[in-house]
Amino acid sequence: MSSQLVQFSTVPQIPNPPSRHRHFLSERNYIPANVYEHPAALLLERCSSLKELRQILPLVFKNGLYQEHFFQTKLVSLFCRYGSVDEAARVFEPIDSKLNVLYHTMLKGFAKVSDLDKALQFFVRMRYDDVEPVVYNFTYLLKVCGDEAELRVGKEIHGLLVKSGFSLDLFAMTGLENMYAKCRQVNEARKVFDRMPERDLVSWNTIVAGYSQNGMARMALEMVKSMCEENLKPSFITIVSVLPAVSALRLISVGKEIHGYAMRSGFDSLVNISTALVDMYAKCGSLETARQLFDGMLERNVVSWNSMIDAYVQNENPKEAMLIFQKMLDEGVKPTDVSVMGALHACADLGDLERGRFIHKLSVELGLDRNVSVVNSLISMYCKCKEVDTAASMFGKLQSRTLVSWNAMILGFAQNGRPIDALNYFSQMRSRTVKPDTFTYVSVITAIAELSITHHAKWIHGVVMRSCLDKNVFVTTALVDMYAKCGAIMIARLIFDMMSERHVTTWNAMIDGYGTHGFGKAALELFEEMQKGTIKPNGVTFLSVISACSHSGLVEAGLKCFYMMKENYSIELSMDHYGAMVDLLGRAGRLNEAWDFIMQMPVKPAVNVYGAMLGACQIHKNVNFAEKAAERLFELNPDDGGYHVLLANIYRAASMWEKVGQVRVSMLRQGLRKTPGCSMVEIKNEVHSFFSGSTAHPDSKKIYAFLEKLICHIKEAGYVPDTNLVLGVENDVKEQLLSTHSEKLAISFGLLNTTAGTTIHVRKNLRVCADCHNATKYISLVTGREIVVRDMQRFHHFKNGACSCGDYW
């Protein structure tokens, strides 16, 4: 591209005017002595749109005014102003004697539409046509270079500008300053600024905006301070430029000072200022003030609406974001791509598929369905609404996939229980030479954590290290979480201890890891260590601590944390916190307290609260509270067969066979099914899956023969099958059914295919049943093996006939 500046073999051919206009060129009807008084001239002066201009153009030709310099200049200028540079060129080309101002206007037009190639071609043509460049020509070109981040071309124009004698011109230097800032070369922009023999408000505003837009917020504020020290009053552009820096630093006190200055200067009524203030207050956490400003605006543009929608989305209030979006539509404001993306983000957070589909349809009507950023937002929305296949279909049709597109799909699969698909897409992405970023690796690590396969965990850890991202706090936090979920809690702690920087999410991941492994005391110790530092715990921290206490029977410590959350840290309680408290009390057998806690909740209990209560009733075989909890669960979530199965198990433990039958009939009537149990074990880098009673595995005969002998051995050691868990068949058949549960098959296969002393790692999609839990303790005893089982709730470390959960799960 840069060679265009020094040599062109041919002058670019710009289309001639339409033939229907050519015959007018020689016609000259009556023209007043002063062309400015001609009706066509008056129409051009009042022209306010491209449509009007196209209607006026034939009048100019018809009246023979085309050769008048006034009309030539006015037509070219207006077509450029309205962004129709091709039509401006069709007016420009046939002119016999072109004034220099026409060349300058055309170049400005190309710059306005940010067409660098055509702007450069036209600039070279000007040299061929002996048009001497003026300083503004260079500023136009520099503007386009900045808009397109073309640093190399921008530097060449800088060189030409110096050769042309404009190196110290204020306008030229301001243009250079702006170009370097937009090309993310802020230090170069600052050098230009410092070399200026004189500076005006525009040059100061340019450097302020440069710092602000390039993430150097403190420097932006410093420049405003220096500007004021030189007795230059900040303009409304200064305020709009510096407010994003205030937002980035969350300096609301400074923001309020700027707001006060804007009011005293009379700028607060300007729509750009009001919009920037709304954005600043929202990003500084003062959403109420932002909304008051927004509601008080006498005039709003689409950017104002977008700022308010984004404010609610970023402050985790998607319901209000959708209300603002709806109000925007009701007031007839046409949404932009930014509006649509904000609304889609809100729908994703709400899991509102219906409204998400409506916005999808709206985006098609607005012609935004080919906008890659909008499509990426649609993919994310469908993934969060559990419509992953719809998202994958959109991704497949997307012609220009960006890194964001790949990341959205990988995360979507990871969050929807399809980790294998996530890894496959990651592999495809790398094969297409798309370079992964931090977000990609965090998503892939999340998928591997879901798989809970140590080999995969070590593989991605190696990839991360080779990518030099093993010191990135987001990636290392994900690694801590992944290793904990893969059963390697010691490796997780090792990575945690080696981290030079930790976020609250890092502490949360490690505390949660200890909790799911049943190491409640270790979780509490780490929580105490966290409180001594500078990072404050958040709601997720307390949820992890309470859950850790629940899994370890540390009831009093859990209660203390629950009340500390509100009293010491002013953290709002969520439904998850209430559910964790019911689980804490219920697991400990304090069912009366748990039920009283539910009844006294200040908000209506949700499914997770009653689900925790029902789970506790199964542990402690309490039919009374189980029926109460189940009744509420069937109302709140009638389509989940899991709660019906749980209630049936409680009835079965109480030998209430008639009730068991009623639950079964109810499930059949509603078409509800029990989720089949599946256990997975990794052997020699390959994952093997087993379902209860299945003979699909190629080594089934060996597995069942080995398992039969193993059952005999553990019976000799004291194992007694819990036949109460099976109904409707004879005792010997009950034992046979119990012996072929998926956990036992996976463990047997692991023992058959590993050497003595090797730890067996098993993953199950459901809660481990009581019989398998008991049997696995005996298996660890008679084989001398450590067996780690991860079920849907926690980890169980079986060793020497005991489990880390202490039979408390």
UniProtKB/Swiss-Prot annotation:
PPR repeats lie at residues 68-98, 99-133, 134-168, 169-199, 200-234, 235-269, 270-300, 301-335, 336-370, 371-401, 402-436, 437-471, 472-502, 503-537, 538-568, 574-604. Residues 609-684 are annotated as: Type E motif. Residues 685-715 are annotated as: Type E(+) motif. One of its GO terms (molecular function) is endonuclease activity. One of its GO terms (cellular component) is chloroplast. Involved in multiple sites RNA editing events in chloroplasts. Involved in the editing of the site 7 of ndhB (ndhB-7) and site 5 of ndhD (ndhD-5) transcripts, which are two plastid-encoded subunits of the chloroplast NAD(P)H dehydrogenase (NDH) complex. Involved in the editing of the site 3 of rpoB (rpoB-3) transcript. Required for the activity of the NDH complex of the photosynthetic electron transport chain. Possesses low endoribonuclease activity in vitro. The DYW motif is dispensable for editing activity in vivo. This is Pentatricopeptide repeat-containing protein At1g11290, chloroplastic. It comes from Arabidopsis thaliana. The gene is PCMP-H40.
